[in-house]
Amino acid sequence: MSTGAPDSGHHERAVVTEERARAFLAAGELELLGRIPWASNATVLAKVTHEGLEGLAVYKPARGERPLWDFPSGTLYRREVAAYLVSERLGWRLVPPTLARDGPLGVGSVQLYVDADPEVTAFELLADEHPALARIAAFDVVTNNADRKAGHCLAGPDGRVWAIDHGLCFHVQAKLRTVLWDLAGTRLEAGVLADLESLAAEAAGGGPLAAALGELLDGDEVAALARRARALVRTGRLPAPRGDRAYPWPLV
């Protein structure tokens, strides 16, 4: 994952570690390049510069969130950050480095930009039976993702698959909407189940993860995360769709 191409001889292109990426996003200067037009909320492509490095990030300011009837106003950016923390705790590294910080349009989430192939979505990855999708589907179950569109699965230049756009996650009521229902019934690997069991214990146990999530979500949402993880461990399989609102719209 690259931080992006340079625009002068004074900047260098860098492949960054997770820790370095977070420091880069936290301390870097944000220059807004333009709004990403297909996003439903204000989503801005930004150039980040810090200590001779420059790269791209996706900035989602709280003030640009559209009001929703089922998610509290001004919380979507925090859900983006919470999804990253869950991904990291699981050890799956599905979500690009993401953090909350102040920016030119106020506080919001800042996520390292993934230079992905625009022709590859979850539909193409499903057709190729990419192994990362089962973990993404499990991740969506436990985070209760209400908006897993096909375009929210990105194929990076190294073949790695990333999951983005998690502002509509962590609701206490069942809201799972995804294009990954083709994987329903898939038995999850033992290692995946062990990761989920550990996540459930930590989310419910009042330790560092629970504390970090508690700064981003309310207590009921953190408790619901733990319950969903435990339930998925008990069944050991990805669930089937329920009801008539199982798919996001648009699909891509």
Describe the role of every protein-language-model region.
Residues 21-125, 129-146, 150-151, 157-166, ...:
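Conserved ATP-binding subdomain of kinase catalytic cores across diverse folds
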